[in-house]
Amino acid sequence: MHIGHGHFFQNLDGRPDHEVWRTEMALADRAERLGFASVWAVEHHFAGYSMSTDPLQFLTWVAGRTHRVKLGTMVSVLPCTTPSDWPSTPACLTTSLVDV
């Protein structure tokens, strides 16, 4: 069975941005240790409840701290990125641990 851990960067209670990021980073640090098979991140723009505009930035950080969890994006909003640049970022992370 494959169980993944999703990160939504939700800020429903008005916490400072750095607190939301620290919380998500702490959860990601625990994911591999607790046996999760993957870590997933979303991309949301122009939404007051979520502050994840670049899931690949977060997944790059996770990749540098983990060894076996797979990494994936739950949502990638391609119109908000440069199409020619987008494939190069996940390609730099790894060849076998990224699902986009």
Tell where the protein language model's regions lie, with residue ranges.
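Active-site nucleophile and cofactor-binding loops and adjacent substrate-binding regions
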Residues: 73-81
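Flexible, glycine-rich active-site loops centered on histidine and acidic residues
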Residues: 2-19, 80-100
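N-terminal beta1-alpha1-beta2 module of alpha/beta enzyme domains
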Residues: 1-73
